[in-house]
Amino acid sequence: MLNENEKENYYATMKILVSACLLGENCKYSGGNNYNQAVCDFARGHQVVPVCPEVLGGLPTPRCPAEIVQGVVTNKEGINVDREFRAGAAKALAIAKENGVGLAILQSRSPSCGVKEIYDGTFSGTKIPGQGVFAKMLMDEGIRVLDAGELPKIILKNEDGKCQSD
């Protein structure tokens, strides 16, 4: 078990995997990004490992939007892209493990990176509880995963001293 000084040093130098789109990289399906200032502020001072599992899986940017349909990643045109998503997730997981990542901050609702909810597979914008392919792989490996949308709440709670994130 780490003592208080060791904990402080560990968290000060923690390696954090971050969805590349959250850092401003134009790798989102639309060709844009999901730049998130709270994520950048939180990551400052840590070693950041940016990844986009979808790009690592060989998908182009921009690309047709995809959702998980009955457990299979399928794009809006009905094309099965599950192999690309799973290959990219496996490559991103290998990067996380090679770098000794202790925490991952991922883009909300993505079929790769959704942490607590994803789109329901109807391409209607309806969300359901669930995890993206990459988020689930990280969780299965015991790597702590946070949804980028929850980060501001976690930071505020910690600054108030009322509670810490799970």
Short names for language-model regions:
Residues 34-75:
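Short, surface-exposed acidic-centric catalytic microdomains
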Residues 24-31:
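Short N-terminal binding/cap micro-motifs at the start of the first secondary-structure element
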Residues 6, 11, 26, 56, ...:
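Divalent-metal-activated hydrolytic enzyme cores
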Residues 12-16:
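Extreme N-terminal starter segment of soluble prokaryotic enzymes
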Residues 24, 57-59, 111-114, 153:
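Short, active-site-adjacent cap segments at secondary-structure transitions
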Residues 21, 107-110, 150:
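Short, well-ordered beta-to-alpha junction loops that form the rim of enzyme active sites
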Residues 107-122:
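Internal, conserved structured core segments that host functional sites
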Residues 6-9, 35-48, 88-103:
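Short amphipathic alpha-helices and their capping/turn segments at secondary-structure boundaries
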